[in-house]
Every structure is written in C-alpha cells, then in structure tokens.
Amino acid sequence: MEMYETLGKVGEGSYGTVMKCKHKNTGQIVAIKIFYERPEQSVNKIAMREIKFLKQFHHENLVNLIEVFRQKKKIHLVFEFIDHTVLDELQHYCHGLESKRLRKYLFQILRAIDYLHSNNIIHRDIKPENILVSQSGITKLCDFGFARTLAAPGDIYTDYVATRWYRAPELVLKDTSYGKPVDIWALGCMIIEMATGNPYLPSSSDLDLLHKIVLKVGNLSPHLQNIFSKSPIFAGVVLPQVQHPKNARKKYPKLNGLLADIVHACLQIDPADRISSSDLLHHEYFTRDGFIEKFMPELKAKLLQEAKVNSLIKPKESSKENELRKDERKTVYTNTLLSSSVLGKEIEKEKKPKEIKVRVIKVKGGRGDISEPKKKEYEGGLGQQDANENVHPMSPDTKLVTIEPPNPINPSTNCNGLKENPHCGGSVTMPPINLTNSNLMAANLSSNLFHPSVRLTERAKKRRTSSQSIGQVMPNSRQEDPGPIQSQMEKGIFNERTGHSDQMANENKRKLNFSRSDRKEFHFPELPVTIQSKDTKGMEVKQIKMLKRESKKTESSKIPTLLNVDQNQEKQEGGDGHCEGKNLKRNRFFFW
C-alpha cells in the first residue's frame, strides 16, 4: 500500500472492503479489494480462487487484475477502477435503459459469459452490481469470488451461491449437479430488470423465491419436483400449479418482441432447455440491422483509447499472437544455442595442441662442416627461424632432429608474451647421440630453448620429472641474440666439456667392472642441489639399470645424463656464460 494513496471507500461486503486509491507514480486510479482477516478458511479460499481465475483468463469484457500483494496478513487485489455499474445506471434510469444502450450492454455481457463458458468456467454470481460500466460505455464482468470450473460427473458444488433474486431453481432446491445454465438464468432475470428498471423475482427467502418462480415462470420439472418433495427444508409445503402462455411475447408483454424471445429462452425451468451463450450471441436481436458489424469497430476503438489512458494496463494480445511470438522466441533461442555450441567446438579444436612434426635432416660433409638448417615454416605460415646458427664439429653420420613448436610464436613478443626480443621462441635443433663416437655431442647452446609444450622422444619422457623437463628454461629466463664474441666463448666451453665428458665416461666404465659385493656399497656422485633434487633419486635407479643393459651389449655406447644446473653452479665454474656486461641465465648440460 506504500505505492498507493487512499482516496476513500467504494463498498463493503461480507468478505472485505473495496477502497478507491491512486498510484503515486502514475496517478492512475485503482480499486483495491481487501479481504478480511478471519480464522476460517472460507475467506482465503474465495480470495485465492478469484486470483487464480483473473490471472488465468483475460478478455476485453472482464475486469483487469493489476497486481496482488499481502500486507498485515491481508490479501490485497488491485483492479482497474470503474466506479460505475449497471445498478447505478438503473438507479439513474428508473424505467429501464433505452433500447440502443441496452443492446450494446447485453452484447458485451454475453461476450464475457461466452468466454467463460467456452473455458468451462461458471461465474455463479451474475447480477447488476457485478457488471462494471466505464465512461466510454464498455461493460466488464467482475467479482470472481464465486467463480469455479465446471465439475466432473459425480462432483458437487457449494450449495449457497449467487444472490437470491437471480438464483436459478436448481440452486434454490440445492441441487449439487448444476452447471453453466445457472448463469443463463441469472442473465434472463437481469435483462428484464435492465429493460424495465425493476427486479423480476425479488424475494425475502428461498421459499418466497420458489413460489414466485412457479407463479411467473412455470411449474417445476419432474427432477426438481422430486428434490423438492424430499427436502426437509420444504417439508409440508405445497406449490401451486399455474398455467402459463407458451408465447414469449404474451408471457413478457413489457418487453420488446425479440428481447422477450431471448428472456423466454433463458428462463426455462429445466436447465437442459435453456439456451447457450453462443446461441444468444447469434440471436436475431443482435444480428438484425448489421448491429455486430457496426458495433465491433467502435468497441475496438474504445478499448484502445482506454488502454492508452491506463498506464498500468497494457492491451492483451490474442492467444494466437502469443503462440506465434513464443514460437519465434524459441526459434531464436535454439538458433543461438546451436551457433554458440558450434563456435565452442571450433574454439576447442583450436585450443588442442597440434602434433609435433619431427623432421630428420641428413648432414653431409666433413667433421667440421655442417649445412645450415632449412628454414621452418610453421603451420600458421607466420614465423620463420633465422637460418644462421653456430657451427660445431660433428661426425658425417650425425642426423639433426628438428622439433617444431605446435603453435607459431609471434616474433614481436618474447616467451612470456612481452614485446622484447624478436629471436625468442622457435624451433630447437637437437643432435641425437652418436653411437660410433665416445665423445657425446652437446646441443647448440646458441639455439633457442625448449618450449614447455614441445613433445620429446620416449627416452626423454622417461627422464623428465613432474616439476620440470630436462633442458627446460624457467619462465623468467631470457634469451638474446648471440654475438660473435659469445660464439667464440661457447666454442671454448664446448671443447672443455667434451674432454670432461670423456673423463666421466671412463670413470663409469671402471665402476661397472666392480664385483657384486662392491656394488652393494656403490655410491653415485651426488647431484647438484637443484629444484628437482628429490625427483632425481628415482631417475638414478633407472639410469643404473639402463647402463647395465647397455654395458652387456657394447662398452663403447654410453647414455648421457643431462642435468639442469642453476645459476650458482655456473658462477663456481669460472664465470662461463657472461655476455658483455649482461648476466644471462642459461641451461648447462653435464655429461658423465
């Protein structure tokens, strides 16, 4: 209620009050029905039933429910405000409504009733007070507190419904198997009142109403007479037998001829003999003079005009239009899902690392000659490696194993993705072990370092640890383009290491010739303390087994062990690896 300003009380009933309020933001006048707070469940049942029907069914001639909320344990229903009813019209026109106005009102009321009946809904409380009339002449059926769905065979309804004056004889006799005809009976009584200005069957009790029905309309049917005779309420009561004219216009002389026919068709004692709402809409009373064709455009224009004035109420779309829009939304949604799924699959394919192509190039020439490696083209066709490499002496049978990276690296960015060194990242040229020469060839130190995602050979996989692969550079290490001074220094380092590797290999041969008793106390030289010192223990056991197998086959073939020596170990070896004032972190390869 904070959003509404109370203007006054409109009405009050047995179940609650209706307040006239104004929306503070839009200024629209609304009617708020407030249900009483009572311990019994009947009030909540009626309120929830009305909410259910108003949310489920929408029609031009049904009152619009704007919102529902609960405050202080009271249910509040907010409706569009129409403070005028048919009863107010009858109080203004004491002798009844004029014929043109009456036909327009009745046509709209029948449209609302036919809409409910087509959805198997019975209103059960049709009367002049529940027919709202707007300033432009649009009628709307309201008060769905007693409305309910049509019962299945064998089900029963509430016995007390509808206002007494408009109650059908089956309701008066408390027949629980009633249906849609009760609304048609109430409509017939209301038509007479709207045409004459006086209620047709005013009564003070059910017995009084039943007596007037027999006098003005007709005698009870055999089924209703049986219920009447067995009812303890009417025990000892005898109803009169009256002969009524069969002609409708003689029976209702105060009514217009066609209107009298409609009333006669509505007020039939037997519910099965009453006319339906759809047949009433096609009655001659509405079809003559092209009334429907002329009035419908006028009605549509008035509805659109009211929809513009009422900011909180939007014009309802037809069910077919809603279905078409829902189908369009579903189609757009499914197309969006399909496109997104296809795009996701393509992205996943691009994310998968491509297979590494290993190209073996035979090198011809002498021991000190080696041909320049061919320029590699990445699969993306973007990057190429510089063909100028440092030359190291190799045997004529040596084969170069070229490992290409799975993804091309932009030369404008470094290994960490920073724009720095154009030579950072690329292919790595790694010579395999020469089995015919005891001197083991080291990898080209000036070539680019291993990429973390490069796939190594099977033997290299076995030697790799979980923390860092052999020959892999730490993420923060940098690689710069080697100069001529650096290449000369590296040649000296390489010659020094080859001699050191021969000495280490000879020591391994001697150690393998020990006796079994000595082997039990055999200790390998301790590895330098690195990040992977814990994991190299398991690697040493595998190397021992591998060396034993190779020693049985041939004593000339030895397998090197590559160790990653950190920067501190480099400094102890005499300052190797310094490059004209710049301290560079490099990978050292020990052979022993």
Curated annotation (Swiss-Prot):
Task: Please give the superkingdom of this protein's source.
Answer: Eukaryota
Query: Phosphotyrosine: which positions carry it?
Result: Y160
Location in the cell: Cytoplasm
Ligand binding (ATP): V10, G11, E12, G13, S14, Y15, G16, T17, V18, K33
Q: Which family does it belong to?
A: Belongs to the protein kinase superfamily. CMGC Ser/Thr protein kinase family. CDC2/CDKX subfamily.
Q: What is known of its domains?
A: The [NKR]KIAxRE motif seems to be a cyclin-binding region.
Q: Which PANTHER family match?
A: CELL DIVISION PROTEIN KINASE, CYCLIN-DEPENDENT KINASE-LIKE 3
**By what name is this protein known?**
Cyclin-dependent kinase-like 3
What organism is the protein native to? Answer: Homo sapiens (Human)
